[in-house]
């Protein structure tokens, strides 16, 4: 059985996390905002988790996954806007932010969560990198991976829950690419095999 060190995806994400940590150390901000975007299955969540575990500044960092904000399978755009309005804009002004978790089983909003403006924040998810967040985020990451490998990883992760929605979600991601050009807004592009 191959070790994790032989996994090219894990290796690419570790290398990217180290480079992003350098980017963060180079900022003047004590509470930076980082956004991580890319297609489903690209490695955004894994990258955010690696970065949080190796956060380069004193103190902890808040990690928020848009999967917790999207209001259902047709909610890519709405989930990203909820993050902008409830998390990124308040954080950028030094104000307490908040967001409500989406309960996928009940198909409704659930409990609220506060976002401390004195701490750094990582917001990861498809659709988060757009002109409105480019003006707010200190570090903007685009994670790029081929569609076949992304789909294989996403379906391995979520299986039959995601399978019937893959095309529906992918269409929203394509619309995001056409409308917002996230790759061009990134301060760093991460390529994952």
Q: What do the PLM-derived regions correspond to, one by one?
A:
Residues 1-34:
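Extreme N-terminal, non-catalytic leader segments
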Residues 39:
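P-loop (Walker A) phosphate-binding loop of NTP-binding proteins
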Residues 44:
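Conserved lysine of the Walker
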Residues 47:
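Hydrophobic positions on the alpha1 helix immediately C-terminal to the Walker A/P-loop
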Residues 53-62:
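Post-Walker A helix-loop "phosphate-sensing" segment adjacent to the P-loop in P-loop NTPases
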Residues 62, 68-121:
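Conserved nucleotide-sensing/catalytic segment adjacent to the nucleotide-binding pocket
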Residues 108, 112, 130, 159-193:
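Small-molecule kinase domains that catalyze NTP-dependent phosphoryl transfer to phosphate-bearing small molecules
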Residues 111-156:
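ATP-dependent NMP and nucleoside kinases share a basic, alpha-helical "lid"
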């Amino acid at each position: 059985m191959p070790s994790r060190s032989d996994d090219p995806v894990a290796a690419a994400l570790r290398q990217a996390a180290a480079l992003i940590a350098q980017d963060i150390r180079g900022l003047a901000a004590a509470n930076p905002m980082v956004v991580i975007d890319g297609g489903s299955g690209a490695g955004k969540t894994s990258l955010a988790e690696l970065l949080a575990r190796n956060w380069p500044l004193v103190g902890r960092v808040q990690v928020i996954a848009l999967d917790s904000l999207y209001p259902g399978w047709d909610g890519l755009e709405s989930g990203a806007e909820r993050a902008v309005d409830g998390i990124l804009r308040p954080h950028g002004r030094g104000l307490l932010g908040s967001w409500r978790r989406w309960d996928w089983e009940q198909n409704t909003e659930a409990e609220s969560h506060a976002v401390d403006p004195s701490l750094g924040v990582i917001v990861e998810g498809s659709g988060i990198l757009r002109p409105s967040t480019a003006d707010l985020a200190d570090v903007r990451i685009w994670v790029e991976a081929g569609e076949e490998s992304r789909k294989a990883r996403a379906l391995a992760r979520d299986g039959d829950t995601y399978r019937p929605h893959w095309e529906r979600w992918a269409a929203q991601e394509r619309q995001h690419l056409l409308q917002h050009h996230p790759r061009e807004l990134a301060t760093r592009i991460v390529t994952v095999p």
